[in-house]
């Protein structure tokens, strides 16, 4: 991963002796060409530590590939037989608030993006998308720094943990985690801020982070996710990331985001779900909200039927706070609920918009892969800096797996991971099987008036088989 360390090159040489270790050799090959300098990490080597900070980072990134669940399990792993060290070395590194994890993640991603761009011989015309979404990060330790209760849409109740806001880059073939932030929720009960009593809040671990890199992350904790999403996109553009569409769900689609995207100097558009609420849009017939627009289009008999998606849809160009946008409304069946999409791209057709937006479901698969394979959010440290470190490492590991999968003959991240860890994973499915399941979910959503996207996400989250089927479908479509 750098010129001043031999860990990755030594491992690659070690596995090169056996032709059966193709997967791990591919991972070593990707990591070896990622150039991260020690100065980018933000902390210096400890005098009593035989490894440099860059070598410690390398070893941490290798944990899941050598079936090391956490630092406490390192001494019994095969990796420790090659690079012997004490577990406290890893704890000290992860607890250090001076490590610049956001910059490290971007330093890796920009090199992976460059590798993907230069190594892809067959170019496709699929748009590049930024996808912003969030997921629950449940916790059990009440003394963890900044811990609190959050509302889980999956479980429909408050749980102890963090909300993890993520931003992914997808080109329709593979996706990379670009950025993330951890958030808490103040809650409505002033007597129990963040869902905790005064005694519980006092029992949490606290630390002064002034002057540390993690201070930026602490400041993000109670920041509105909609505002942080804009900051993430700003930073991505600043670092040279280019995209065609920003995909968001109805929680993030608002006037501020529409104005922000439409004012960028690069050519990009917003494509997001909208709530059928009280937001007014300027039309030729005057100001109308979403429900009024639907009634107007029905009255004008402007609704059409799409045979491919088997749904009724209608379209109208309007203005939101002076910004021209196109609205799409669709429903399945006569009694189905209407759903709305908004885009700043006035040239986009309904079918194109639907297909592009469907890519957002890939985030659910990515979350599932990270949680089941890479210990996403499983860090047990009370230090908030260690929580940030753990999430970043997981995303780095996932991005490496995605890059290897793209250029090698692996259909899924799970299949690649299984081969790396000498495990077996039977993956056999066809597009038709997934199509049947998708139809079932859509019909159930229509019959019981449930949001299809949320139902599908919950189905994938709670059912390993459904997750595998969806995973296979995405990658087969991409190929």
What are these regions (language model features)?
Residues 126, 130-136, 350-381:
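Short amphipathic alpha-helical "interface-anchor" segments enriched in bulky aromatics
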Residues 18, 42-45, 95-199, 312:
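Active-site-proximal, Lys/Arg-enriched surface segment
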Residues 266-279:
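Acidic, His- and aromatic-enriched active-site or binding-groove loops in soluble protein domains
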Residues 38-114, 171-176, 230-239, 243-250, ...:
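Short, positively charged, Gly/Tyr-enriched micro-motifs
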Residues 67, 83, 88-92, 154-243, ...:
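Electropositive, glycine- and tryptophan-enriched low-complexity nucleic-acid-binding patches
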Residues 140-143, 254-263, 279-286:
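A short acidic (Asp/Glu
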Residues 1-52, 66, 78-82, 184, ...:
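A short, flexible helix-boundary coil/loop motif
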């Amino acid at each position: 991963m750098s010129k001043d360390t031999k860990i990755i090159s030594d491992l690659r040489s070690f596995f090169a002796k056996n032709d059966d270790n193709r997967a791990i050799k591919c991972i070593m090959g990707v990591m070896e060409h990622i150039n991260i300098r020690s100065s980018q990490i933000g902390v210096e080597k400890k005098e009593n530590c035989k490894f440099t900070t860059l070598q410690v980072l390398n070893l941490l990134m290798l944990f899941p590939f050598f079936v090391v669940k956490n630092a406490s399990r390192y001494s019994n792993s095969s990796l420790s037989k090659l690079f012997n060290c004490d577990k406290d070395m890893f704890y000290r590194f992860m607890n250090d608030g001076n490590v610049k994890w956001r910059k490290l993640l971007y330093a890796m991603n920009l090199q992976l993006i460059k590798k993907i761009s230069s190594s892809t011989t067959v170019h496709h015309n699929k748009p590049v998308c930024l996808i912003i979404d969030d997921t629950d990060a449940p916790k059990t330790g009440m003394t963890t720094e900044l811990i609190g209760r959050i509302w889980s849409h999956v479980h429909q109740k408050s749980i102890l943990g963090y909300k993890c806001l993520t931003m992914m880059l997808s080109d329709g073939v593979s996706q990379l985690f670009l950025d993330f932030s951890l958030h808490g929720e103040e809650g409505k009960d002033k007597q129990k801020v963040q869902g905790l009593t005064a005694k519980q809040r006092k029992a949490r671990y606290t630390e002064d982070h002034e002057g540390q890199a993690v201070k930026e992350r602490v400041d993000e904790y109670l920041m509105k996710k909609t505002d942080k999403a804009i900051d993430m996109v700003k930073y991505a553009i600043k670092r040279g990331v280019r995209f065609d569409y920003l995909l968001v769900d109805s929680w993030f689609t608002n006037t501020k985001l529409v104005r922000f995207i439409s004012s960028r100097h690069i050519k990009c558009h917003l494509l997001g779900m909208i709530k059928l609420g009280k937001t007014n849009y300027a039309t030729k017939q005057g100001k109308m909200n979403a429900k009024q627009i639907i009634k107007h289009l029905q009255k004008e008999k402007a609704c059409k039927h799409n045979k491919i998606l088997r749904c009724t849809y209608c379209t109208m160009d309007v203005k939101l706070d002076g910004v021209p946008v196109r609205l799409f409304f669709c429903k399945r069946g006569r009694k189905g609920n209407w759903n709305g999409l908004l885009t700043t791209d006035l040239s986009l057709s309904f079918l194109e918009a639907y297909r592009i937006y469907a890519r957002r479901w890939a985030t659910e698969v990515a979350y599932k892969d990270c949680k089941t394979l890479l210990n996403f959010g499983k860090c047990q440290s009370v230090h908030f800096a260690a929580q940030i470190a753990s999430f970043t490492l997981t995303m780095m590991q996932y991005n490496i797996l995605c890059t290897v999968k793209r250029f090698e003959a692996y259909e899924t991240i799970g299949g690649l991971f299984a081969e790396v860890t000498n495990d077996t994973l039977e993956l056999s499915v066809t597009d038709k099987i997934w199509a049947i399941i998708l139809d079932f979910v859509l019909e159930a959503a229509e019959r019981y008036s449930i949001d299809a996207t949320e139902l599908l996400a919950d189905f994938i989250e709670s059912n390993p088989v459904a997750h595998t089927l969806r995973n296979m479908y995405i990658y087969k479509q991409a190929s």
